[in-house]
């Protein structure tokens, strides 16, 4: 969409663009020429990385539920359930892994990054929670770079092997289930 002074029906836009919402992330940026990254994310996504974003992230769950798994300051995993119609503001620098199940849609808004402002994608062992791998990027294309980071991790058995407990994370990610 171009920068125009015109509204549009977001649900219609989602319906017309849902074929673009593909795993592992299932995201599509709405406007390319904005100072914000406003994107629709659909489910099911297939990711297990934790994103450490230098800016706040605003979540609005349009359809179904989204589960945002966060790492607390104490290093514990905590899941925030964002129900249909709910909003959630995730503070900057909180490691988080958004999980979406089938037939769900949400809007996420974050700001574009300043030059030199870096962020991380981090993988933790499913068995012992040890940090296994970290990728630091200057984010310029969220649709492309997140997928590349996930693919790089999933395709490399050496970095999927936990150096702490020996557990090997599977290459293929199952649809996330809230426990």
Swiss-Prot record:
Gene Ontology cellular-component annotations: cytoplasm
Catalytic activity as recorded in UniProt: 3-hydroxyanthranilate + O2 = (2Z,4Z)-2-amino-3-carboxymuconate 6-semialdehyde
Coiled-coil portions: none
EC supergroup of this enzyme: oxidoreductase
GO molecular function terms noted in the UniProt entry: 3-hydroxyanthranilate 3,4-dioxygenase activity; ferrous iron binding
Record-given protein name: 3-hydroxyanthranilate 3,4-dioxygenase
Cofactor binding remark: Binds 2 Fe(2+) ions per subunit.
Keywords carried by this UniProt record: Dioxygenase, Iron, Metal-binding, Oxidoreductase, Pyridine nucleotide biosynthesis
Function statement: Catalyzes the oxidative ring opening of 3-hydroxyanthranilate to 2-amino-3-carboxymuconate semialdehyde, which spontaneously cyclizes to quinolinate.
Lineage: Bacteria, Bacillati, Bacillota, Bacilli, Bacillales
Its EC number(s): 1.13.11.6
Listed Gene3D superfamilies: Jelly Rolls
Binding annotation for Fe cation 1: 51, 57, 96
Pathway note: Cofactor biosynthesis; NAD(+) biosynthesis; quinolinate from L-kynurenine: step 3/3
Cofactor(s) demanded: Fe(2+)
Sites where the protein binds O2: 47
Positions of Fe cation 2 binding: 125, 128, 162, 165
Presence of keyword Membrane: no
Residues reported to bind substrate: 57, 100, 110
Family affiliation: Belongs to the 3-HAO family.
GO biological processes: anthranilate metabolic process; L-tryptophan catabolic process; NAD biosynthetic process; quinolinate biosynthetic process
């Amino acid at each position: 969409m171009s920068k125009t002074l015109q509204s549009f029906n977001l649900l219609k836009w989602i319906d017309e663009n849902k074929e673009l919402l593909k795993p592992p992330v299932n995201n599509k940026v709405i406007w390319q020429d904005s100072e914000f990254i406003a994107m629709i994310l659909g489910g099911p996504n297939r990711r297990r990385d934790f994103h450490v974003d230098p800016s706040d992230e605003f979540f609005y769950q349009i359809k179904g539920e989204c589960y945002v798994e966060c790492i607390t300051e104490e290093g514990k995993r905590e899941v925030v359930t964002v129900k249909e119609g709910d909003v959630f503001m995730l503070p900057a620098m909180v490691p988080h892994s958004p999980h979406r199940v089938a037939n769900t849609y949400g809007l996420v808004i974050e700001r574009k990054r300043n030059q030199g402002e870096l962020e991380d994608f981090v993988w933790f062992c499913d068995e012992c929670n040890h940090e296994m791998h970290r990728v630091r990027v200057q984010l310029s294309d969220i649709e492309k770079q997140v997928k590349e980071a996930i693919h790089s991790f999933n395709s490399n058995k050496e970095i999927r092997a936990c150096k702490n407990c020996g557990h090997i994370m599977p290459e293929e990610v199952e649809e996330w289930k809230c426990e």
